[in-house]
C-alpha cells in the first residue's frame, strides 16, 4: 500500500523564538499521581458527555509492534531533535528523552487505551469554539457540549500526557454534526520541548494527522 506523504508527524514552527521547556505546567500538575489523575479526569469527561445512561469507560493496556506506531520514523526524528535541545534543560529532560527513544525503538510499545460508550464523543470539527479544538489545540480554555458539565477541557486534559512515558496521546472520536451525520476524527499529539531541526526552530508540540494546518484525519 502506498503511504500518504501528507499524513504523519509535524511540529509548528517557532517564529518568535520562544522557549518551551520540559517542565510543562499542565503535565507537572498531574505528574505526582498520574494514575489516579487520569482515572478521575477521564471519568469526569465521560460523565459530562453521557448521551445514553449509563455511560461506560473502559481502560485496557495493550502492546503493539514498533512498526505499527503511527509514522514512527518521523516521531523518532522529533525525539532525537528534542534530545539534542534537552542538553540545555538538565538531567531530568535528558533522562526522559533517552528513555523515550529506548521505548520507541524497542520491539513493542505499550498503549493504555481508554474507550467510552454511550457518550456524545468529543464534538468537532477542529475549529475554534468546538470541544475537539479545546481538547487538542487550546490552552487555558475549556469547551464542552453541556454548559452544566462538572469538568472542563482546561488543566484536566493534560492528565493523559502526564501518564504517558512519551508525553503522547492518540485520540479517535465519533460525534454527530449539526446535520445529525456521524463524523469521525483521529489525531495524535505530543508535548515535548522547543527544538531546532534543519536550521528552523519549532515549538514543543508535535501533531500526527493531516500535515496541512495540523488537522485530524476525518
Task: Outline where the language-model segments fall.
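Bergerat-fold GHKL ATPase/HATPase_c domain
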Residues: 1-110, 123-130
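Aromatic side chains
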Residues: 30, 153, 207-208
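Flexible ATP-lid and adjacent glycine-rich G1/G2 motifs of the Bergerat
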Residues: 87-180, 189-192
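Flexible phosphate/Mg2+-sensing switch loops adjacent to catalytic phosphate-binding sites
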Residues: 53-74, 133, 169-212
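Structured mid-domain segments that build the active-site/substrate or prosthetic-cofactor binding neighborhood
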Residues: 217-218
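A generic structural signal for solvent-exposed, polar alpha-helical segments
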Residues: 15, 81, 138-141, 159, ...
Amino acid at each position: 500500500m502506498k503511504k500518504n506523504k501528507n499524513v504523519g508527524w509535524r511540529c509548528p514552527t517557532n517564529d518568535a523564538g520562544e522557549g518551551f521547556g520540559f517542565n510543562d505546567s499542565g503535565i507537572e500538575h498531574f505528574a505526582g499521581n498520574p494514575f489516579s489523575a487520569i482515572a478521575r479526569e477521564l471519568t469526569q469527561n465521560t460523565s459530562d458527555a453521557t448521551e445514553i445512561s449509563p455511560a461506560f469507560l473502559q481502560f485496557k493496556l495493550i502492546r503493539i509492534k514498533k512498526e505499527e506506531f503511527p509514522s514512527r520514523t518521523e516521531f523518532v526524528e522529533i525525539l532525537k531533535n528534542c534530545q539534542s535541545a534537552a542538553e540545555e534543560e538538565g538531567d531530568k529532560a535528558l533522562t526522559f528523552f533517552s528513555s523515550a527513544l529506548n521505548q520507541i525503538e524497542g520491539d513493542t510499545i505499550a498503549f493504555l487505551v481508554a474507550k467510552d460508550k454511550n457518550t456524545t464523543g468529543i464534538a468537532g470539527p477542529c475549529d475554534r469554539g468546538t470541544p475537539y479544538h479545546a481538547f487538542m489545540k487550546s490552552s487555558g480554555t475549556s469547551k464542552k457540549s453541556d454548559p452544566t458539565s462538572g469538568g472542563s477541557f482546561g488543566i484536566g486534559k493534560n492528565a493523559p500526557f502526564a501518564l504517558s512515558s512519551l508525553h503522547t496521546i492518540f485520540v479517535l472520536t465519533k460525534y454527530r454534526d449539526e446535520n445529525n451525520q456521524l463524523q469521525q476524527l483521529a489525531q495524535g499529539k505530543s508535548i515535548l520541548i522547543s527544538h531546532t531541526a534543519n536550521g528552523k526552530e519549532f515549538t514543543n508540540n508535535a501533531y500526527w494527522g493531516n500535515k496541512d494546518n495540523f488537522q485530524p484525519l476525518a
